[in-house]
Every structure is written in structure tokens, then in C-alpha cells.
């Protein structure tokens, strides 16, 4: 059982640049620096809200170096989720055909989706001291051509209850998708998206990279403070016509160059329910 999306892992040739970007834009704080021999990387972890972002920089050969050699740029390499029993979650994933490796009290889970390694990390539940302008991460997005197949792989690997899943469609961004909501009443999920318009940004990304992580999404109380911290051209803002600039937009999308290779959406509190199956839960401004 998974309870929340608790981290993103970023493969990067320059961890310091990524860390500094998250500190500058989101007020994130460094909480850990160590080596991960099994990944052939050094790791710098920043706290962003109640969630963590791990920057992995190669210090030799291994899967992080391989991913960077293939992609040629920093990118979301894996997504993490918390579980009350990571060992049990690992057994479920292994029985579903995933490749599983232990790292201390957490587990790396690798699924093959359309020939690509899609990686996750399952960690114990933990109370974290919040830092910065975010409240918490709640979503990591996987792009896949075979949406049903990818959803089934993730469902089976993590023992998720598909009766809680909901669908999502966007003509504006050119996709259809499924939100694999972990628990009733909570936003945390993996999003599986199939681009349907090759002329749009997501469609072009998928055509170039294939099955892969695309972005993360978070919630924050004060999106205006995040707006103010981002250089011109580094963010797309969704503020309804007529709403005062002093009030929160509904959401923003922070572009990858602004955050060290990570595309991050940030929504105001409750707003994500608008596209998560329960629009009545959205608090109006």
C-alpha cells in the first residue's frame, strides 16, 4: 500500500545548480548529502514543503550515468512514494515482475514500460519538518503510448485499488490519462498520460523520449510568492481572467530550466480536485 508521493529523484550532471535553483525559487533546504554506490552517484537531498527532491550526480558508471548519457540533460529519473510497510510493498512489486533492489530501509522498484525502465522508490512513512514555499508533492507523471498497459503495470506492482482511479483529458495540452489515486480523499497518485497531439509540448516530448517521467505536481498556499521568485519566461501562469494579481492563480507550471531540469506544476490548495474527479471539493477564491 502506498500512502503519498513523497519525493522526486533527478538525474543531473550538475547537482549544485539544481539545488541552488530549488533554494532560490521554492525556498528548499538541503537536508542530506551522501553517496549511493548502487546507483554510481552522489546524492544531495533538498526539502521542499513536506517532500524531498534528490539530486543524483554520477560519480562513476551506473544507471544514473547511463540515463544522462541517453537523455543528454537533467531530468526526473524516478518518483518516490511512502508506505507503512515498504518491505511488503517490495514483495508485491517483485511478485508482479518488477526488478527490486533494497537501499537501507527503502526499495528501488523498476518497471519495464514499453521497453523503458520506469523507476520508483518506496520509503517508510515519515514526519518531515516542512521547508520553503511548497506544501507537498502529490503527483508524478509517466508518459506512455499504451495507457491501459502502463496503468496495469503500476497498479499490479504497488497493489493499488483501481476503483479509486479517475480519468483525465485535456484538449488544451493534448492528452488523455489516468490518475492512480492511492487513497480516498487524498490527492496523491501517479499520473499515466498518453499524448494525443504530436504538435503540442507533451506530444513532442513523448515522441523524443518515449515512455518516461514527464513532471511532478505540488500544492502550495502562496503561489504569488512563487511567481515573484521566478525569472521572466520561466513559468506559465493560470490565473482566471478578472482575478486580482494579488490573489493566487489556480496553478502555475515552472519550466524545467528554472528548476534544474524538473517541470513542476503547483496548484493552490484544493484546486487539483477540479481535474481529479471531485470538483465540488475545490474552494473558490
Walk through the language-model features, giving the residues of each.
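General N-terminal targeting signals
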Residues: 27, 45-47, 69-72, 159, ...
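N-terminal beta-strand motif that seeds the catalytic metal site of vicinal oxygen chelate
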Residues: 1-19, 74-81, 121-155, 211-216, ...
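An N-terminus-focused feature that recognizes amino-terminal "leader" regions
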Residues: 1-63, 266-268
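ER-lumen resident redox/N-glycosylation machinery signature
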Residues: 29, 34-35, 60-70, 127, ...
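Hydrophobic secondary-structure block in the mid-to-C-terminal portion of proteins
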Residues: 142-173, 182-188
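Vicinal oxygen chelate
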Residues: 4-13, 44-49, 52-54, 64-145, 166-169, ...
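Amphipathic alpha-helical segments
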Residues: 15-29, 88-96, 146-162, 226-233
Amino acid at each position: 500500500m502506498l500512502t503519498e508521493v513523497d519525493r522526486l529523484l533527478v538525474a543531473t550532471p550538475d547537482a549544485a545548480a539544481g539545488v541552488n535553483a530549488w533554494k532560490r525559487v521554492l525556498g528548499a533546504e538541503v537536508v542530506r548529502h551522501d553517496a549511493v554506490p548502487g546507483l554510481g552517484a552522489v546524492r544531495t537531498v533538498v526539502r521542499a514543503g513536506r517532500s524531498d527532491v534528490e539530486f543524483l550526480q554520477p560519480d562513476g558508471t551506473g544507471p544514473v550515468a547511463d540515463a544522462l548519457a541517453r537523455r543528454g540533460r537533467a531530468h526526473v529519473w524516478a518518483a518516490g512514494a511512502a508506505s507503512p510497510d515498504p518491505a511488503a510493498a517490495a514483495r508485491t512489486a517483485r511478485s508482479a515482475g518488477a526488478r527490486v533492489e533494497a537501499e537501507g530501509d527503502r526499495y528501488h522498484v523498476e518497471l519495464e514500460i514499453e521497453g523503458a525502465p520506469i523507476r520508483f522508490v518506496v520509503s517508510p512513512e515519515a514526519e518531515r519538518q516542512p521547508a520553503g514555499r511548497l506544501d507537498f508533492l502529490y503527483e508524478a507523471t509517466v508518459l506512455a503510448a499504451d495507457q491501459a498497459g502502463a496503468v496495469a503495470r503500476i497498479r499490479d506492482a504497488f497493489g493499488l485499488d483501481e476503483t479509486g482511479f479517475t480519468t483525465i483529458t485535456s484538449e488544451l495540452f493534448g492528452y488523455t490519462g489516468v490518475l492512480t489515486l492511492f487513497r480516498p480523499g487524498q490527492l496523491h497518485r501517479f499520473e499515466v498520460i498518453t499524448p494525443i497531439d504530436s504538435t503540442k509540448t507533451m506530444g513532442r516530448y513523448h515522441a523524443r523520449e518515449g515512455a518516461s517521467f514527464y513532471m511532478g505536481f505540488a500544492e502550495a498556499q502562496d503561489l504569488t510568492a512563487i511567481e515573484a521568485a521566478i525569472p521572466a519566461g520561466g513559468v506559465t501562469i493560470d490565473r482566471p481572467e478578472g482575478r486580482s494579481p494579488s490573489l493566487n492563480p489556480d496553478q502555475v507550471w515552472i519550466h524545467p530550466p528554472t528548476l534544474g531540469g524538473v517541470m513542476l506544476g503547483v496548484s493552490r490548495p484544493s484546486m487539483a480536485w477540479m481535474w481529479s474527479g471531485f470538483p465540488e471539493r475545490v474552494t473558490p477564491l
